[in-house]
Amino acid sequence: MRLVQLSRHSIAFPSPEGALREPNGLLALGGDLSPARLLMAYQHGIFPWFSPGDPILWWSPDPRAVLWPEKFHLSRSMKRFHNASPYRVTLNYAFDRVIDGCANHRDEGTWITRGIEEAYRRLHELGHAHSIEVWRDRELVGGIYGVSQGALFCGESMFSRQENASKTALLVFCAEFIRHGGKLIDCQVLNNHTASLGAIEILRRDYLDHLAALRQQPLASRFWVPRTLFLPRK
């Protein structure tokens, strides 16, 4: 196994099965963040992740973290919070502000560089990248953005400025996603936060099988049209 240098003249990627074991999933470097290359990457289970000043690095880790939306873990405390929630959740209302929020909410720095922001804004303009926003009155207090692949949604990042805001975004999105034919959410690499919400790890080859099938399955018509999302409270 060796790290592959991508060409600027071809958007092809090597097989994810050739990714390094350490660091886990590192597959290639270089290339660019053009819409065509990004879409090619997501179609093959690959995503960019690199620090400011580093070359573009492309990853496909094994195992892969995923969330089956019907398995979202709603804790008792979160259920009580949601039943009296002061938040309003929207879809694709403020993509630029969500990705900016994800880039700026970490004190220790971010991997979301200006180039990443510009690249995903272009994907959003083309209808491939989407955002879920959480509002308290008129203030944006949390959100998620990611890339759609048919009935699979590749979550990229989330942020929260007030209590349970990003959890609310994911909870409401999961319910709406299921209702419109969504099957799986890619969480890339498992962490304590996503694990607490129900994410699990599966083998990369199993993720790639799911991706190949689900990206061919369209969601219900006009699912990504900007609108307010609702979840019945119980």
UniProtKB/Swiss-Prot annotation:
GO molecular function terms attached to this record: leucyl-tRNA--protein transferase activity
Keyword Acyltransferase: yes
Protein name as annotated: Leucyl/phenylalanyl-tRNA--protein transferase
Record keywords, A-Z: Acyltransferase, Cytoplasm, Transferase
InterPro entries recorded: Acyl_CoA_acyltransferase, Leu/Phe-tRNA_Trfase, Leu/Phe-tRNA_Trfase_C, Leu/Phe-tRNA_Trfase_N
Protein's job: Functions in the N-end rule pathway of protein degradation where it conjugates Leu, Phe and, less efficiently, Met from aminoacyl-tRNAs to the N-termini of proteins containing an N-terminal arginine or lysine.
Record-linked Pfam families: Leu_Phe_trans
Gene: aat
Keyword Protein biosynthesis in record: no
Organism: Salmonella dublin (strain CT_02021853)
UniProt record similarity statement: Belongs to the L/F-transferase family.
